[in-house]
Amino acid sequence: QTYLERDLQALRAVENLADFRRLMRAAWLRIGGLLNQTEMGRDVGIVQPQVHRFLNLMEASYQAIRLPAFAVNRTRRLIKAPKLYWSDTALALFLAGETEPRGTHLENLVLMDLLAWRDVQPRRPEVLYWRTATGIEVDFVIETPRRVLPIEVKAAARVGPSDAKGLEAFLDEYPDLADGALLLHGGAETFPLTRRVLAVPWWRVC
């Protein structure tokens, strides 16, 4: 028996496996994107309460991961849409017909390593993302009690200062919280990308 038939039905929350499978496929296709439950339900023909219940079940069973947004005001974090990721990057790659992690699949891989690192820290930091109303975005923000570290992920082997625009915007917005940032890339060298951004091969930190 599969995870679907055995484990989830044992939780007595999946009354329609066909609907659940459709929603899982929709989740796989949205890795790294903002979670819009209304849109997702409309795309797969599932009513909103069921979408909400199934997503909660995916998260409770360690399949889906909802990444919260960074905001200094913690109340605002609760109302901002989370980003959706998947706990099994290899499975997500297989279902997408890919063999190497690129784009959002590379983001997903990096996130899994960040979460594994977070879980063994004595003072557990938070892992979040940042996005402005105008669409400027940073893939991940590591928040400790005193400081934050913004991180951007690029699969390209060659990166330039223009790839750090989101990171620089974050550093400008929160000068009292962050004074540096990381850009993880697909190349082989570690070097200063800008005065405040260090470029590091992603495989050196994952």
Spans of features found by a protein language model:
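Domain-level recognition of nuclease-like catalytic cores that cleave nucleotide substrates
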Residues: 186-206
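Short beta-strand-loop-alpha-helix junction that forms the active-site gateway
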Residues: 153-161
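Arginine/glycine-rich "motif VI" loop of SF2 helicases in the C-terminal RecA-like domain
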Residues: 119-122, 169-177
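Accessory nucleic acid-recognition modules appended to NTPase machines
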Residues: 1-148
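Short glycine-/polar-rich loops that comprise or flank the Walker A/P-loop
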Residues: 146, 176-180
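Short beta-strand/turn micro-motifs composed of small residues
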Residues: 131, 154, 183-185
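Switch/connector loops and helix/strand junctions flanking conserved nucleotide-binding motifs
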Residues: 94, 160-161, 190-194
